[in-house]
Amino acid sequence: MGTTSDEMVSVEQTSSSSLNPLCFECGQQHWTRENHLYNYQNEVDDDLVCHICLQPLLQPLDTPCGHTFCYKCLRNFLQEKDFCPLDRKRLHFKLCKKSSILVHKLLDKLLVLCPFSSVCKDVMQRCDLEAHLKNRCPGASHRRVALERRKTSRTQAEIENENGPTLLDPAGTLSPEADCLGTGAVPVERHLTSASLSTWSEEPGLDNPAFEESAGADTTQQPLSLPEGEITTIEIHRSNPYIQLGISIVGGNETPLINIVIQEVYRDGVIARDGRLLAGDQILQVNNYNISNVSHNYARAVLSQPCNTLHLTVLRERRFGNRAHNHSDSNSPREEIFQVALHKRDSGEQLGIKLVRRTDEPGVFILDLLEGGLAAQDGRLSSNDRVLAINGHDLKYGTPELAAQIIQASGERVNLTIARPGKPQPGNTIREAGNHSSSSQHHTPPPYYSRPSSHKDLTQCVTCQEKHITVKKEPHESLGMTVAGGRGSKSGELPIFVTSVPPHGCLARDGRIKRGDVLLNINGIDLTNLSHSEAVAMLKASAASPAVALKALEVQIVEEATQNAEEQPSTFSENEYDASWSPSWVMWLGLPSTLHSCHDIVLRRSYLGSWGFSIVGGYEENHTNQPFFIKTIVLGTPAYYDGRLKCGDMIVAVNGLSTVGMSHSALVPMLKEQRNKVTLTVICWPGSLV
């Protein structure tokens, strides 16, 4: 449920009422059995509205008869009735299914106003409101403190007035103070009872703990779902082999990211329900396909293959400095030990080596070499080499962090002592973590071997061709295409683009407008700076003419046949009216700069720690002008708590200074020198859905 800005409800005006408890997930007053309340900034499209509560959908469910309702609205309705609210066909709640991930994403992107409007004027996406209330909103923070003080004083008064202990929460109930927290919102000051915890955990549609906001010191001490700095294999099951995994991905060897990185994990998806993968995790292998250094679209095709069981080899980069680790003895084969001396042009030059640790063998190992880097040019090092020592410092039981510190502190000469096994040891390269298989047969994936990094300039991977088309049609005939995007759209600042061209339509007969084309102009009217609703209105108005002139940009991704024919994943032929189609992340990267939409993100910190993100790119990494990409967001840092930066975002300026042509070794010190505040100008493109 919710309201638009014209009928906005301020929580300060109603919070004194004792009838409805205050929910700290939405910041409004409602009972836990009711939907969250939101103050929406704009009118919401009818297709995204529940026809029971007449508000934007929350936890949407699809009925077999083709209608969509809020989870709680439909559940409450079917407790008394046995038919669909719209067409009155017989309906059972168990036959309803969760709506597609795309619908969830559209709903999550709806803009809402902070309910504490007297002290906070922020506008954000609906999915970001809970994190805003937990970590950034002064009004919510003051309200939590006031409720906690009221609870403490009331509890003390009850204890003083009673000889024996007072049971505040009888079986099956919650005290008014506990109930005012609302379903699914757990402030730092309180803990859920076991009864309420089970109810909260089983409620469909709530955030998966795997990507829950960290709200206090205790949360960072909880065990991680995957080990950090280690290559791990997990097993994912899905009952329907054709259902999407529920993640968006960025990366690929067209970019400095090289590997495939998870940008977002969508609630209610297969990956979210599994609960182990997070945004920022790298996917190195899918079943028998090594995707550690392949094109973005090849990796997307591999991840989109229909199968009931996926074995994903993943890497979660280390996020915390001092993490205990166990060393185990390993029966390694005969090793070749040799010395490698690398000479840097200056002390700030990067070696271009990616170091990791393994779970069953101590020490530091080379995961990857960046093309154009010093180590790759030298040619003597390779992936899977073990680093025994650097400049005389013993690393037989060392960590990648220690190795990085030694390299950073060294001068222009770095001496490496390397051990190379006589033959590969598959058992030493992959760890099976938390296998969810119910089968007694243990799956052992093939060994992971990293390919040399070889990304190239994006201009070689994506081509854009402008085309001018004039179509003649009947006055009342529609153009016959569906579009998405628009400035301020739910998926981000995107241009208007074609999502499908239905058969038998005017444009389908003409054949020149294709799915994925970016629309620039119609009948002389510019579309590039319009919102989605404005662009749709303009297209409909122009379609009334007997002749329609379109200017569009055809974006094509150039694929190289780098994989053998037998390695190619099986793909299904796609037609121009495929309802499940969504654009590729690489498609956005190739757009001309005139279609880019930059926005500023201001990060603040009260201590001289990390800003909380890692970057790749810059001139030094491959001797071309590659942009800077965000690769990792670190838990418990300013970037993480702010919530706006995502993996795959491009940093185009820092404090107004352009990063074009800047080297990696120049940008990193600049970011570190900023003390309490930094302004990042970024371009954010949505990752590819899989």
From Swiss-Prot:
It comes from the Eukaryota. Residues 233-318, 339-422, 468-554, 600-688 form the PDZ domain. GO terms for molecular function: identical protein binding; PDZ domain binding; ubiquitin-protein transferase activity; zinc ion binding. Pfam families: PDZ (PF00595), zf-C3HC4_2 (PF13923). Transmembrane segments: none annotated. GO terms for biological process: neural precursor cell proliferation; neuron differentiation. InterPro entries: PDZ, PDZ_scaffold, PDZ_sf, Znf_RING, Znf_RING/FYVE/PHD, Znf_RING_CS. SUPFAM superfamilies: PDZ domain-like, RING/U-box. Keywords: Metal-binding, Repeat, Zinc, Zinc-finger. A zinc finger (RING-type) spans 50-88. GO terms for cellular component: plasma membrane. A motif (NPXY motif) lies at residues 208-211. Residues 198-224, 418-455 are annotated as: Disordered. PANTHER family: LIGAND OF NUMB PROTEIN X 2, MULTIPLE PDZ DOMAIN PROTEIN. The NPXY motif is required for the interaction with the PID domain of NUMB. It is however not sufficient. Interacts with the phosphotyrosine interaction domain of NUMB. This is Ligand of Numb protein X 2. It comes from Homo sapiens. The gene is LNX2.
